[in-house]
Structures are given as structure tokens and as C-alpha cells.
Amino acid sequence: MHIVTLTYKVPNDEVDRHLEAHMAWLKEGYAAGTFLAAGRRVPRTGGMIFAAGGRDELAAMIKRDPFNVNGVADYTIAQVNITSTADGLEKLKG
């Protein structure tokens, strides 16, 4: 599993201009089975995406994110080997 951290490089009003397209991109990731969960960081300085699959596939998807294409955010990818979970979250292991 990977945790993607987005850090905004622009003011939130600029982020908001690209938010609808970013949300559509997230939906594509969910439909593909790559994205498991996502949300905004608090305070609103960026976001996080929990993702399954390979790092190369994920990096290719990030290149297509409207936030990336339009210079809205920087990204880091951390790989995590989940070894234990609460009931119902076994999909995160591996």
C-alpha cells in the first residue's frame, strides 16, 4: 500500500479552481481499484490518498492529476507494509 501526500503550492482559491477536475480524477482511481481512501489535511494545506497497487502505476496516475498538471500541488509517495488491521480493513494488508 502507498500513502500519497499532497502539499498545496498555491492559495486555496487557486486549488478550488481545479477541485472539480481533481475529484473526477479521484473517481477514476477508485473505479480502477487503485485508490482506497482520500481526504484533505487539516488545516487545509493539501491532502492524502491511500492507494493499492504498484508504485510505477501510481506515479503514472499522479502525472495525470489536474492538481499536478496545473502546478497546484507537490506529491510524496510512501510505501507502507500493513501487517495488521481492524476487522473489515484486511484489503490494506500486503
What are the language-model segments listed below?
Residues M1-G94:
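Conserved, structured core segments of small domains
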